[in-house]
Amino acid sequence: MPEFGPAELIVVPMPGDAPEDIVVDAGGALWTGLVDGRIVRIGPDGMVSVVGQTTGRPLGMTVAHDGRLLICTSPGGLLAMDRTTGHTEVLVDAVDFRPLNFCSNVVELPDGTIFFTQSTAKFTYANFKGAIIEARGDGGLFRRDPDGRVITLLDHLYFANGLTATLDGTALVFAETQGRRLSKYWLTGPQAGTVTVLAEHLPAMPDNISTGSDGRIWVAMVTPRNAAADALAPRAPVLRKLVWALPDRMQPQIVPEVYAVAFDPDTGAAVAGVRMKRPDFGVVTGLVEHRGRLWMSSIGFPAVAHCAVPA
């Protein structure tokens, strides 16, 4: 993968810690969710306000075609929130009679069909490192039809995370954080219902993703690949469990960087990006293009940030 350089970054403080994802609505307002469950709106004028509250930790989100904000929470499942009143409704809290404890990201098609990921069936967000270390491959991709029926499309994914639709609507692109891989789930054409790998052996762990105005797939690289975590992946499950039982300071750690990469949606080539270290921002977990700027969110800092969209 090419080496990408720094960019001029503007950091915007949030009224709380760890805004995990960031999305934009049709009116130009940005939305994010804090670790304590507060849902925050950043208006086109830059004014920051708290609009709602979730009981679980808000993670990936998207603006639905009916105007509501779809929010993945852990625990809690998939919610829909009225962006004016802050009222929330549970859309999915279980799949195949199992609690949806780690809903990770969500996207909606124009016909109202919703797709969402679950990172792991065992852990919640509070213990996400356990899923990475144990490397069970128990994440999944699901579809919620407009009538409310939920169908499992894919399972055995290695920490399924970011999810976006391609600009032409022919496929979904999803990220596997522990697998360090981007894949396409085809929605139309002769390959419909099948999966092809878009990019693999990534130099960092991908988190949330989004589709840019030109169709490029923007990927939040939450942390560079960790040699210790890589070495654990093929080991016996009992050894991985022992490592997970160690004190946090002895486990593989996240390296705080500002790291985001754009991939060609057809070839999987890395075509643009930004990478740098800052004392006031890093650990990028979400990103979205908005008015020529690349906005980024982070679980490591009480802020979001933005820079010019890299060419």
Feature annotation, model-predicted:
Residues 1-311:
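Sequence-structural signature of mature extracellular/luminal beta-sheet repeat domains
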